[in-house]
């Protein structure tokens, strides 16, 4: 559904959304017959180029500052990880500050602290980037299995809170098959 590049107005956005509903969710189209935007600012359209920035910036004064969360790790919003990333980054940084005590908070500490956060965030990046591509056959199989298995559906939903849980079964066809089989065996 990468079809938003020419959408410039609220009405065009609403119309494109309704076209998508009619094409992919026709059983819901009738329910959307009288739909309208709440206001002319009630839409969002854009894209983000995923990137990871250097964590430490030197200001004109010579002081160094440590960036955090989505100021450093920019993801497409498709997986809704912006708030998660900010909270997870703040937790990592706070613990690193507390552990560091009264020592100097220099570039080395800042880079090490970011690396601790990156240990989590790299999984968010990998998963989010995978969602920008057409799903491979094993992910389609996984989603189909989730529609028939509450434990599999729960595993997927719960991994939104900690995308590290998606590895390796989201990314590897063999691991995915084993994941599905294990959950089916436990359900039996």
Give the location of each predicted region.
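FAD-binding beta-loop-beta segment adjacent to the flavin cofactor pocket
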Residues: 45-77
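C-terminal helical "tail/cap" subdomain of flavin- and related membrane-associated enzymes
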Residues: 79-80, 94-188
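Residues forming the flavin
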Residues: 1-10, 63, 69-73, 83
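A broadly tuned preference for mixed-charge, low-complexity surface segments
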Residues: 26-47, 115-133
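Intrinsically disordered, low-complexity segments enriched in Gly and acidic/Ser/Thr residues
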Residues: 10, 17-23, 37-38, 80, ...
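Arginine residue identity/basic-tract feature
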Residues: 22, 31-33, 47, 53-54, ...
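Conserved FAD/dinucleotide-binding core of flavoprotein oxidoreductases
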Residues: 1-45
């Amino acid at each position: 559904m990468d079809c938003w590049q020419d959408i410039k107005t609220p009405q065009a956005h609403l119309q494109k959304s309704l076209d998508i509903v009619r094409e992919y969710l026709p059983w819901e189209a009738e329910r959307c017959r009288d739909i309208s935007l709440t206001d002319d600012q009630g839409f969002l359209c854009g894209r983000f180029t995923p990137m990871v920035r250097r964590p430490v910036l030197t200001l004109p004064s010579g002081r160094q500052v440590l960036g955090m969360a989505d100021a450093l790790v920019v993801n497409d919003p498709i997986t809704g990880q912006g708030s998660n990333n900010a909270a997870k980054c703040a937790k990592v940084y706070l613990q690193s500050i507390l552990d560091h005590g009264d020592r100097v908070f220099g570039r080395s500490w800042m880079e090490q602290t970011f690396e601790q956060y990156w240990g989590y965030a790299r999984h968010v990046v990998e998963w989010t980037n995978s969602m920008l591509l057409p799903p491979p056959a094993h992910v389609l199989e996984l989603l189909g299995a989730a529609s028939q298995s509450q434990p599999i559906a729960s595993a997927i939903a719960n991994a939104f809170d900690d995308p590290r849980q998606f590895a390796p079964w989201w990314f590897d066809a063999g691991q995915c098959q084993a994941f599905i089989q294990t959950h089916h065996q436990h359900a039996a």
